[in-house]
Amino acid sequence: MDLRDIKEFLKDALKYIIAIAVILIVAIYVVSFQEVIGPSMNNTLKSGDITVVNKLVFRLRNIKRNEIVSLKKDDKIMVKRIIGLPGEHIEYKDNILYVDGKKIGDSRSSSTKDFKLESIGYDTIPKDMYLVLGDNRTNSSDSRTFGLVKKSDIIGKVNIRIYPFNKIKIF
């Protein structure tokens, strides 16, 4: 091996190292793939669906109601919908969502049992905390059972369902 071969080898190696570093940075800080597990998001997302999670978006803007998010709770990664925002009082009565006493449309659920924020120990949602529910309200472990979710436990926004291929959808 002469000096030119060594230089060429080092150039190629550097290209691969840079490519791997970029891929790792994107995977750690920008996007990830997540499989939906369980029926809690039926019919929006079903068990086995693969989604793309945008990890960067909530560093750039606030979380909004009705966004689908990936979160970590009790060492489990799950997908839920944001229903309640910081400073709000949430109540479900007769299958209708009320935010601060005002009726809000919620067409994603066919059946939601009556629920008040007070039943999980709050009058209003504290700063940097959120109330999340599964779209399949009758079969979901969500804020009604495990409490509010800290902003720091929200991994990112579910942007796209990429599998199954015949049901690709942008959210």
Give the location of each predicted region.
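Short strand-turn-strand beta-turns centered on an Asx-Gly dipeptide
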Residues: 99-101
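Structural motif
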Residues: 49, 64-68, 88, 129, ...
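Short, surface-exposed secondary-structure edge patches
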Residues: 40-44, 59-62, 81, 87, ...
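Protein maturation boundaries and topogenic segments
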Residues: 1-77, 149-153, 157-171
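Mid-length scaffold segments of soluble, non-membrane domains
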Residues: 77-81, 85-97
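Soluble extracytoplasmic domains of inner/organellar membrane proteins
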Residues: 118-171
